Regions:
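Metal/cofactor-centered catalytic core regions of large enzymes
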Residues: 60, 69, 73, 240
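Structured mid-to-C-terminal alpha-helical surface segments
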Residues: 131, 135-138, 142, 148, ...
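Catalytic metal-binding acidic patch
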Residues: 31-64, 173
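A generic fold-level signal
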Residues: 17-18, 36-38, 168
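Conserved NTP/Mg2+-binding pocket subregion across the NTase superfamily
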Residues: 67-180, 191, 201
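Helical scaffold of the NTase/Pol beta-like nucleotidyltransferase catalytic core
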Residues: 1-28
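Short, solvent-exposed loop/turn segments at secondary-structure junctions
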Residues: 28-31, 49-52, 181-182, 189-190
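Generic structural signal for hydrophobic core residues of well-folded globular domains
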Residues: 47, 93, 177-180, 184, ...
Length: 258
C-alpha cells in the first residue's frame, strides 16, 4: 500500500507530528454524504506520544483544532482536526464508540506499519454489544431532531427553516442505524456508505420527518434482529487488545529512540 504523504498537523500546533501513525478524512465526507457547498473537512488521526506523556504524571489523550470561528458555523474552507492517542482511541473502540470504530474501516490518507497491526485485525475490537452505542447515538440524534434534547443548533437553523427539521440530524439517524445493522451482520462498516445517495437525499430534505422516523425505526429493528444472530463475540477480548497496545507502544518507542 502507498503510505502516502503525512498531513502537516504541526501548522495547527500539534506537537507530535513525528509520532503520527495514521490519518483519515472523517465526517460527512467519509460517509459519502458531503455537500461541497456547506461542509468543512474533518481530519482524524492517531499518534503515540513519548513515554513520559503515557507513563508520567502529565498524560494526554487528544489534540483538537478548528479553523472555524466559535460564534459561527464552519464553512467549506474550514478544517477540523481531531487526533487521539492510540491508547485513548483503543479504549473508545473497545466500548463500541461509532466514531472510533470508523478508524478501522475508513480510507486512509496516511498510514504506518504500526497502524497496520491494528487495521488488519479489526475483529478484536468488535462485539455484539456494540449495537447499543450505535443505536444510542442514533436515538440521541433523533431526540435532538425532535427538539427533545439539547439546544437548537443555531448554525443549522436554515435547515429547519427550509425543510421543517434539521436534515443533518436525520441523516445521522439513518446512517448510524444502518451501520449498526451491517456491523452485526457482516462484522464491518463500509465507508463510504453503500446508501450514500440516500443519505445525501435526506440531507437535501427529500424525505418527510414521518418517513425519517419510520425508516429509522425499521433499521433499528433490523439491527437488533441482526444482533441476535450475529457471528461477533458477545464482548471484546480486552486482554488481547491490551497486549496489542503494549507491543505497539514498545516497538514504536524502540524504533524512534523513545
Amino acid at each position: 500500500m502507498d503510505r502516502k504523504v503525512k498531513p502537516d498537523f504541526a501548522q495547527y500546533g500539534f506537537a507530535h507530528q513525528e509520532n503520527l501513525i495514521m490519518a483519515c478524512i472523517g465526517g460527512s465526507q467519509a460517509h459519502g454524504a458531503k455537500l461541497s457547498a456547506t461542509d468543512d473537512t474533518d481530519w482524524y488521526g492517531l499518534y503515540i506520544p513519548p513515554p513520559t506523556n503515557v507513563l508520567g504524571l502529565e498524560r494526554e489523550e487528544h489534540f483538537v483544532f478548528t479553523t472555524g470561528g466559535k460564534l459561527g458555523g464552519n464553512g467549506p474552507r474550514d478544517v477540523d482536526v481531531c487526533l487521539y492517542t492510540l491508547m485513548k482511541w483503543a479504549g473508545l473502540a473497545a466500548k463500541g464508540n461509532p466514531s472510533a470504530l470508523h478508524f478501522l474501516f475508513a480510507p486512509l490518507e496516511f498510514t504506518t506499519h504500526t497502524w497496520d497491526h491494528f487495521s488488519v485485525r479489526p475483529e478484536i475490537f468488535l462485539a455484539k454489544g456494540h449495537v447499543k452505542p450505535f443505536l444510542g447515538f442514533a436515538d440521541d440524534q433523533m431526540k435532538r431532531l425532535l427538539g427533545q434534547k439539547g439546544q437548537k443548533n443555531v448554525h443549522r437553523s436554515e435547515l429547519e427553516d427550509k425543510h421543517g427539521y434539521d436534515t443533518k440530524y436525520a441523516m445521522h439517524v439513518i446512517r448510524l442505524c444502518g451501520e449498526a445493522k451491517e456491523l452485526m451482520e457482516h462484522g464491518r462498516i463500509t465507508l463510504p456508505r453503500p446508501n450514500r445517495d440516500e443519505l445525501i437525499e435526506i440531507r437535501r430534505g427529500k424525505y418527510s420527518l414521518a418517513e425519517i422516523r419510520e425508516l429509522g425505526a425499521q433499521l433499528e429493528s433490523e439491527a437488533l434482529a441482526a444482533q441476535a444472530t450475529s457471528p461477533l463475540p458477545d464482548k471484546v477480548d480486552r486482554d488481547a487488545i491490551s497486549r496489542l497496545l503494549a507491543d505497539a507502544h514498545l516497538r514504536f518507542w524502540s524504533a524512534s529512540g523513545g
